[in-house]
């Protein structure tokens, strides 16, 4: 397989925080990781490292290879090629040592239906010599009133919150969280973000797998964008968004219908799309004036004109040609 070359790598002058992170021992090291299922290449020569104390995001649409990457990283799957180290440990040959330092919450984890929430927490707590404060975890995650409920009676969102608690209950040095806020309401999602920030502030390294761009922008120090099993970009959310802002985007409502070629003929315009009654134009240079003047010359008025500020989602679309909520496979 060809070696993956990220389309965007870290650039510019590193901040003092980034310099300190680079000087620390990597908590996670993945080199040339590949995994196939028959004719399907799920992970294609992916390499990255995560510094101790960093919140590192792995982003991409459903089916991009994110979950397979972390399942190989924690030893649940054997890669076809590549090396993985977690705090210097091999997750395949040093499983017991890895379990002592890594907490995991997987997207499709399941627990016994006939156990109560309290029993599950007590069972997991007993696995560790220095467990976390369970009361604090369940309070932040909104599970206090569910302690006496059976697992089978929990909603999808409640099961998700319990799985996050179980990943953190052992006071791990590395926490791997796969789609941790899927199924949560907006307030519960933000409460969970606050919890994760607090965990990181205590020195825990967080590997966060998500397709929620806002979550990555708010939480992550750096993000790896993965699409079709390949690493397409690796940088801070701010710098990835800044790359997307190398272009411009304007939205407006036209007073009358027009042929897209009216605008695509302009040198400043790279693309024209339609979003309901709005027209969305991407381009560069003096885009707004060029579009408005061209429309006016054709007798068309641009109403509700908005110059859009681009973000991490736009960076992902620019790099992959699709949104993170899209997916090719389950």
Predicted regions and their residues:
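Short, hydrophobic secondary-structure boundary micro-motifs
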Residues: 114, 136, 304, 326-328
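Short, charged/small-residue-rich alpha-helical element at the C-terminal edge
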Residues: 246-322, 330
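A generic structural signal for secondary-structure junctions
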Residues: 42, 103, 125, 129, ...
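ABC transporter nucleotide-binding domain
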Residues: 194-282
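ABC-family P-loop ATPase nucleotide-binding domain
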Residues: 1-34, 322-330
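ABC transporter nucleotide-binding domains
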Residues: 25-30, 35-228, 233
């Amino acid at each position: 397989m060809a070696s993956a070359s990220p389309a965007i790598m870290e650039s510019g002058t590193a901040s003092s925080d980034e310099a300190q992170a680079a000087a620390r021992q990597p908590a996670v090291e993945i080199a040339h990781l590949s995994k196939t299922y028959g004719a399907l290449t799920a992970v294609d020569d992916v390499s990255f490292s995560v510094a101790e104390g960093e919140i590192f995001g792995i982003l991409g649409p459903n089916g991009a290879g994110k979950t397979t990457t972390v399942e190989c990283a924690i030893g649940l799957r054997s890669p076809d090629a590549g090396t993985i180290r977690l705090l210097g440990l091999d997750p395949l040959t040093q499983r017991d040592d890895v379990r002592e330092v890594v907490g995991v919450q997987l997207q499709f984890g399941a627990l016994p239906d006939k156990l109560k929430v309290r029993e599950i927490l007590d069972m997991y707590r007993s696995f560790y010599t220095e467990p976390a404060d369970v009361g604090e975890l369940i309070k932040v995650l909104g599970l206090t009133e569910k302690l006496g409920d059976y697992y089978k009676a929990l909603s999808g969102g409640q099961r998700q919150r319990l799985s996050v608690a179980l990943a953190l209950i052992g006071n791990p040095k590395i926490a791997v969280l796969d789609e941790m806020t899927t199924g949560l309401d907006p307030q519960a999602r933000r409460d969970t973000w606050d919890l994760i920030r607090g965990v990181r502030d205590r020195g825990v390294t967080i590997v966060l797998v998500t397709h929620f761009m806002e979550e990555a922008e708010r939480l992550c120090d750096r993000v790896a964008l993965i699409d079709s099993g390949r690493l397409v970009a690796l940088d801070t959310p701010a710098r990835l968004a800044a790359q997307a802002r190398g272009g411009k985007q304007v939205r407006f409502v036209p007073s009358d219908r027009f042929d897209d070629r009216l605008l695509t003929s302009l040198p400043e315009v790279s693309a024209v799309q339609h979003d309901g009654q709005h027209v969305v134009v991407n381009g560069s240079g003096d885009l707004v004036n060029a579009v408005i003047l061209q429309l006016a010359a054709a007798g068309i008025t641009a109403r509700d004109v908005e110059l859009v500020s681009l973000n991490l989602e736009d960076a992902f679309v620019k790099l992959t040609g699709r949104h993170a909520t899209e997916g090719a496979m389950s």
